[in-house]
Amino acid sequence: AIQDVGDFYLTYEPTEVFKEYEDWLKTEQYFEDQIPFLNDQFKLPYDVAIKIDECGVPNAYYYSDEKMVVICYEFISHTDYKFTNFLDSVYGDSWTIEDLNYTVLNVIDHTLYHELGHAFIDIYELPTTGLEEDVADQFGAYILLEFPYGDDDQWGQDAMIATAFDFWMAAEENPDLFTPEDFADTHSLNQQRFYNLACWTYGFNPNDNQYLVDDGLLPESRANGCEYEYTQIVSGWDSLLAPFLQEE
């Protein structure tokens, strides 16, 4: 067991370039809401920062030497850009800024918990088998679906599917032939990450998400095993995290 002497805390690094995103995030209060959830849920042996910062590239990171998660303003800006185009292509003029904001927050939600997956593996010295990047995607799924933001099942499922489409769009940004570097990367291919997230969402609730199969987004050959896959993720994380959860 560990001593619970630490807390998650949030910092916004001031930004000139991405001021509108900094202001928007502070208005939405998404990150502000995650801090008490995390501190109520998890014991920490030391403080861990969640920082919103300029990084020079659209990405997010966990730094094990600094015990810090960084979500980049560039990542939020790029997600905003991608989903503006996505909503245009799917809905034409009939989408609202609320639709866009909801979807961007959805993607931020999985991204934050993906990075926190890396953080918990490091902080709690959790054993993993398989690529840690896949395990972090599974942790994101576990939190979004089992502990949905705002106690709303639908949010978690929407966040999973929005993030899946984000991976698909990332794949389409580089449609050329795969390089050895792509296959050697520590992440699964973006297309694979799309199908994984779709599968686990379907596995969480096949009835609500049957459209994924009906619309051809998730092949039936994969869908057949998704309930089992998702159950395995939940039981695995339940076991791994048990020693580190706050007592009720």
Task: Report the location of each language-model feature.
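Short pre-active-site segment immediately N-terminal to the catalytic Zn-binding motif
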Residues: 82-85, 89-111, 124-130
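Sec-exported extracytoplasmic/periplasmic mature domains
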Residues: 36-43, 117-125, 141-149, 202
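Zn2+-dependent metallopeptidase catalytic core
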Residues: 22-46, 79
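Acidic/histidine-rich, surface-exposed loop or edge segments in extracytoplasmic proteins
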Residues: 2-23, 120-122, 144
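Pan-zinc metallopeptidase signature
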Residues: 1-11, 15, 178-248
